[in-house]
A protein has these predicted regions:
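Active-site-proximal alpha-helical scaffold in enzymes
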Residues: 86-116, 165-194, 255-262, 349-370, ...
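Glycine- and Gly-Pro-enriched alpha-helical subdomains that act as flexible
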Residues: 261-309, 327
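Conserved catalytic cysteine-centered active-site region
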Residues: 55-109, 151-156, 222-248, 329-356, ...
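Conserved beta-ketoacyl condensing-enzyme motif
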Residues: 22-89, 93-109, 115-134, 199-214, ...
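N-terminal extracellular/periplasmic Venus flytrap/periplasmic-binding protein-like
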Residues: 11-12, 23-27, 31-32, 40, ...
Length: 392
């Protein structure tokens, strides 16, 4: 089997809901990003065999946003492209599929990633096509319906976090402390330019000016335990999950360029990291936030590794409650986890986050001179996905 290398790992800065990226299409966000990723390693777009992109909120984007991204990035129309929807795991599953295609010899070079513009996600009505004789039309929100609602229990993802908090006795104060730590780490990372190598700037044209968007705008550097404590529970009257200790609704994209180790050597490209292994699992949808636990255990077992063998972890912070439970159940050293902050601070553009955690992990390993890293996400509906990468 071909050993698969990452030769470029880039992401956009993450936009707030209704923020800088709200009027920029997913196809443009992704296309601009992929173009810059290719340029960063002077890779001829003609050499790319396939483009695989995660995306969850597809309503209104037009046919196959991955194909649109590829064309916008200057990749020839003769090349293949397709979209992956594994909810929050979409962006990482796209990488898994790219790796597999290279390992079996179907492709030499693949661009994989994820994109989401949650701000641009439309509302819709189900009953308009054949008419409604009486009564009003009801609009539904695609963000809530297709991105944030459990299809089996018909309740918000926040309730799954409440379920975990109750099951593992994770109190509100613990969740707020975890959220504050994420904010502080992210703010410090931005202050120290730790994201400079991974962020590709997006130029946004308005009527009056051009704006370069290159700093994560969702981070709340001035957060405090006092301000977090004032927030009301979001999903349950006497609950513990709030807007402050949950991830945001956000816009952004991330991508990696994959190729075999042999191809990288032929092209004279530096390898950032190698993909060592990956695993996906399912579990009870009512506690979907625990998904990283079995997925991580599975990939470590496949690779004959222990948790102590991993130098850095990027665990997607859907909610503080599930993040705390995951770190406890896996017995993670918190000094190794989300060292630049996580989704509670940076944001969670759902189709992009799977690749975003990978991109951040790759650059953290390089900057911190560490060898092995693991990234993982919980997935709405009751799944988990994990991946291990190494620099050697």
């Amino acid at each position: 089997m071909n050993r698969v290398a990452i030769v470029s790992a880039k992401r956009t800065a993450i936009g707030s809901f209704g923020g800088s990226l709200k009027d920029v299409s997913a196809a443009k966000i992704g296309g601009d990003l992929v173009k810059q990723a290719l340029e960063s390693v002077n890779l001829d777009p003609n050499l790319v065999d396939e483009i695989i992109f995660g995306n969850v909120l597809q309503t209104g984007l037009g046919q196959n946003v991955a194909r649109q991204i590829a064309v916008n990035a200057g990749i020839p129309k003769e090349k293949s492209a397709f979209v992956v929807n594994k909810v929050c795991g979409s962006g990482l599953k796209s990488v898994v599929l790219g790796v597999q295609s290279i390992m079996v010899g179907d492709n030499d070079i693949v661009v994989c990633g994820g994109v989401e513009n949650m701000s641009a996600a439309p509302h819709y009505t189900k009953n308009a096509r054949f008419g409604q004789k009486l009564g009003s039309f009801e609009l539904e929100d695609t963000i809530i319906n297709d991105g944030l609602t459990d299809a089996f229990e018909n309740y918000h993802m926040g309730i799954t976090a409440e379920n975990i908090a109750e099951q593992y006795n994770i109190i509100r104060e613990e969740q707020d402390e975890f959220a504050l730590a994420s904010q502080k780490k992210a703010a410090l990372a931005i202050e120290n330019n730790l994201f400079s190598e991974e962020i590709a700037p997006i130029v946004i044209k308005t009527r009056r000016e051009e704006i370069t968007f290159d700093v994560d705008e969702y981070v709340r550097a001035n957060s405090s335990l006092e301000s977090l404590a004032k927030l009301r529970p979001s999903f349950k009257k006497d609950g513990t999950v709030t807007a402050g200790n949950a991830s945001g609704i956000n816009d952004g994209a991330a991508c990696v360029i994959l190729m075999s180790e042999k191809r990288a050597k032929e092209l004279g490209l530096d390898v950032l990291c190698y993909i060592e292994g990956y695993a996906s699992t399912g579990l009870d949808n009512k506690v979907m936030g625990l998904g990283p636990v079995p997925a991580t255990q599975k990939v470590l077992e496949k690779l004959n590794l222990n948790i102590e063998d991993i130098d850095l972890f990027e665990m997607n912070e859907a909610f503080a409650a599930q993040s705390i439970a995951v770190t406890r159940l896996l017995n993670l050293d918190l000094t190794k986890v989300n060292t630049r902050g996580g989704a509670i601070a940076l944001g969670h553009p759902i189709g992009a986050s799977g690749c975003r955690v990978l991109v951040t992990l790759v650059h953290a390993l390089i900057k911190d001179n560490k060898e092995k890293g693991l990234c993982s996400l919980c997935i709405g509906g009751g799944q988990g996905i994990s991946m291990v990468v190494s620099r050697k």
